[in-house]
Design a protein with these regions (language model features):
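Alpha-helical transmembrane segments of multi-pass membrane proteins
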Residues: 14-33
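Hydrophobic transmembrane alpha-helices
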Residues: 23-26, 46, 55, 132, ...
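Membrane-interface helix termini and inter-helical loops of multi-pass transporters
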Residues: 30-42, 72-76, 104-115
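Alpha-helical transmembrane segments
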Residues: 43-57, 118-137
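Membrane-helix interface/capping segments
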Residues: 61-78
Length: 242
């Protein structure tokens, strides 16, 4: 019964993640949803900037702290190995949903174009960024990344093995294609508001700092010389720079 409960929990966590991920596309793109990055009542500039920074900061702290090996080794003693990743995914998704809900719009225009060719090109780049994100998860192990593999192995009584390091397809061009996809999607828009600009700047800064200061170090410790060799051959974010 406990294993079945963990499976149900993992499926719920993945479903919430999927909803949060799909909503992110509409939220940043300002379409299909009633609450997007530029919708809602515009309030005091200073207070809006502070609230938005706190929302992004909450997500950043949760997302980074819970991903660190030291935290995970303690956390699995509480939630169990099988549901650790699902819990991380669920809490990250809830932090995002809170951000969507409480985000304060700042609609001052930074840039805007009505040139049809430019508009279509920017929407194409926007979609391309999200496609990179999705495809990059498949090039490692999408189901392990979001906790489904762990709950399946627990249900079947399979000993979980650490994933083997591999650098195929997009990972042969940059070391962090998922993050590159997010950055592209966050910046590609035919209409950049002040709120959208702040979102893009702060998320880009977070991605660069989190990857350089934490993720890369954790990967070096976990993988060792093979990852060091990979670092020498493949750039972090910008293709063809090595």
């Amino acid at each position: 019964m406990k294993k079945v409960f963990i499976v149900a929990y993992g499926v719920v966590a993945y479903t919430v993640f999927l909803g949060a991920f799909l909503y992110a596309i509409a939220f940043v793109g300002n379409f299909l949803v009633s609450k997007s990055i530029d919708s809602g009542t515009e309030n005091d500039l200073t207070m809006s900037v502070i609230i938005n920074a706190l929302l992004l900061g909450l997500f950043a702290v949760q997302h980074s702290v819970m991903a660190r090996p030291a935290f995970k080794s303690w956390w699995v003693k509480i939630v169990g190995t099988a549901s650790e990743r699902s819990t991380y995914v669920l809490l990250s998704s809830l932090a995002l949903l809170l951000l969507y809900w409480q985000w304060q719009p700042l609609r001052a225009v930074i840039w805007s174009t009505e040139n049809e060719t430019v508009v279509y090109a920017l929407w194409g780049v926007f979609g391309f960024g999200w496609l990179i994100v999705f495809l990059s998860t498949l090039m490692i192990n999408h189901f392990e990344l979001f906790g489904l593999k762990q709950i399946y192995e627990n249900l079947k009584g399979i000993d979980s093995q650490p994933p083997a390091f591999q650098a195929k397809l997009l990972y042969g061009f940059v070391r962090h294609p998922i993050m590159v996809g997010f950055i592209i999607a966050f910046w590609a828009t035919p209409h950049m508001s002040l709120g959208h600009l702040i979102f893009a700047l702060e998320t880009t800064a977070y991605i660069v700092i989190a990857v350089a200061a934490f993720e890369e170090k954790d990967l070096m410790k976990a993988i060792g010389q093979e990852y060091e060799d990979y670092q020498k051959k493949v750039p972090m974010f910008i293709p063809f720079t090595k």
